[in-house]
Design a protein with these regions (language model features):
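Short beta-alpha connecting loops at secondary-structure transitions
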Residues: 167-168, 244-248, 278, 446-452
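Structural signal for hydrophobic packing residues in well-ordered secondary-structure cores
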Residues: 43-46, 50-53, 61-72, 81, ...
Length: 495
């Protein structure tokens, strides 16, 4: 075999680079044309839909809701989701598909939730608000909720007379395809254009990125990479990311009730939700009592050796989160970790002692599993400090909870902890995204405000899918005097 000359190597390298560039350009051109076709069909459907009155729009929203609330549909979607993603628990996904969709429908059918034409008139200020669509919505959805999240976003988008194109996760694509079939069946019944709701023809990163560029509005729920892609797409967006819920149990809490609620939150759907409790910070006077109550609820407290085994099962070699234990049944986690104690094998969830915050203790972050990190705080001051540090590490702006009977403590944590949701004596996984026993909007996408680098600091709702025209009419002129506005300042500091 002859030795290649430098010229030969350079030429072949240049040709290879050129071929790669051509292939990339071809893929981008294909993505551009594929998305352009989807968007064109969406706009044509919107051309019909924008003439619907509020009653017909609400009927379309009901159609989408029924596509997933219908029990046999909810069950088949849940079965397929667990089968294809390997994440979560079938029974809980059925409940999530139905409960979240029913709650969202309740919000959207509220007589005050107007989204067509004139939605508000303020006679005193002479302002009339007229609701209009934002346009074609690109919705990137996660594998953890491959049916409930796209259905939720579709209901909200259609409430505003928009069209929506869904970019599912690779593992959730088949579930999304089935959901789309169910939705189209219901849209046909009410005579609505089917192209109001579409999905990418196949899962492809370039298609998803091109969709975010060509759409009028982007909403992303999922991984940090997808959220960043949405935020940097150049398109107006509502993109939300990681949670890492911390629940504080103070010395005044109803212990048994708090333990039941934390267990329910921790174990639901095997921890797929960003709203499940990841850590609990317990005041020292009730620490032992609370841990025992959590054990009675099915929790298993790992000793130091078992903690090491569990950490290796979640983060092999201290690296990337292992898919083997992600959103899996506790029996699977026990098997992977090599936990031999029969009580561990039968546990509903696992507890580990919190030994630090940040990279020094990976258990202080979001785990997406039935593992709860338990911290002891000497007093409420220390509990707040710990909570703040944990959320600063992961989950800034998202949410936390407090189990208490002290209104003074409620006010303190509300003032001192920078989150957009603070739930008092609630099941975090149900309450964060709206519940029938609280006043938050039902959603599966929760903004964390500027703390989280998000554009929204509330639960995603239909209002985020509206543009508002504000018609301003003249009103009687009232010009304040300088004395009225500056008098208090002058009296204190002079002119």
């Amino acid at each position: 075999m002859g030795v290649k000359s430098i010229g030969q190597v350079t030429a072949e390298g240049t040709n290879a680079a050129g071929d790669e560039i051509e292939a990339t350009n071809a893929r981008e051109a294909d993505a551009d044309s594929t998305i352009a076709e989807l968007v064109s069909r969406a706009r044509a459907a919107m051309g019909i839909f924008e003439h619907y009155d509020q009653e017909r729009v609400n009927e379309v929203v009901q159609a989408v809701a029924w596509a997933i609330i219908k029990r046999e549909n909810a069950e088949e979607l849940a079965r397929l989701a667990v089968q294809d993603t390997g994440l979560g628990k079938y029974e809980d996904k059925v409940d999530k598909n139905r409960r979240k969709s029913l709650g969202t429908l309740q919000d959207l059918l509220d007589p005050m939730a107007r989204s067509v034409g004139i939605i508000e008139v303020d006679e005193e200020k002479g302002i009339t608000k007229i609701a209009k669509p934002v346009g074609v919505v690109a919705a990137v959805t996660p594998s953890t909720n491959p049916a409930a999240t796209p259905a939720n976003k579709t209901m909200m988008a259609l409430k505003g007379r928009n069209a929506i194109i869904i970019a599912p996760s690779p593992k959730g694509a088949s579930t999304c395809k089935l959901l789309l079939r169910y939705i189209h069946e219901e849209l046909s019944k009410v005579g609505a254009p089917l192209d109001l709701v579409q999905a990418l023809p196949h899962v492809d990163k370039e298609l998803a990125h091109e969709l975010m560029k060509q759409a009028d509005f982007v909403t992303v729920t999922g991984s940090g990479n997808n959220v960043r892609a949405g935020q940097t797409s150049g398109t107006p967006n509502a993109c939300v990311g990681a949670g890492n819920v911390v629940s504080v149990v103070d010395s005044t809490a109803e212990i048994e009730e708090a333990a039941r609620k934390i267990r329910t939150s921790k174990t639901f759907d095997y921890g797929t939700s960003c709203s499940n409790d990841n850590s609990v910070v317990i005041e020292a006077p009730v620490y032992g009592e609370m841990v025992e109550a959590l054990k009675r609820e099915g929790g298993y407290f790992c000793d130091d050796e078992e903690r090491v085994l569990l950490e290796e099962a979640l983060w092999p070699g201290g690296g990337k989160r292992s898919s083997e234990t992600l959103c899996k049944a506790p029996s699977v986690i026990a098997e992977v970790a090599g936990l031999e104690n029969p009580e561990a094998r039968e546990a509903s969830f696992f507890m580990v002692e919190g030994k630090g915050v940040g990279e020094e203790d990976l258990f202080s972050g979001e785990k997406l599993s039935v593992v709860l990190t338990v911290y002891k705080a000497a007093n409420f001051d220390e509990a707040l400090d710990l909570t703040g540090r944990i959320l600063h590490y992961v989950g800034r702006g998202h949410s936390c909870g407090l189990h208490t009977t002290s209104e003074a403590n409620v006010e303190r944590i509300g003032q001192e902890i920078d989150v957009c949701r603070l739930l008092i004596n609630q099941i975090q996984v149900f309450g964060n995204g709206g519940s029938f026993d609280n006043g938050l909007d039902f959603t599966l996408s929760m903004g964390g405000g500027s703390w989280a680098g998000n554009n929204i600091d509330e639960n995603l709702s239909y209002r985020h899918f509206l543009n508002i025209t504000r018609v301003s009419r003249t009103i009687p002129e009232v010009v304040p005097t300088e004395d009225e506005l500056l008098g208090s300042y002058w009296s204190r500091y002079g002119r």
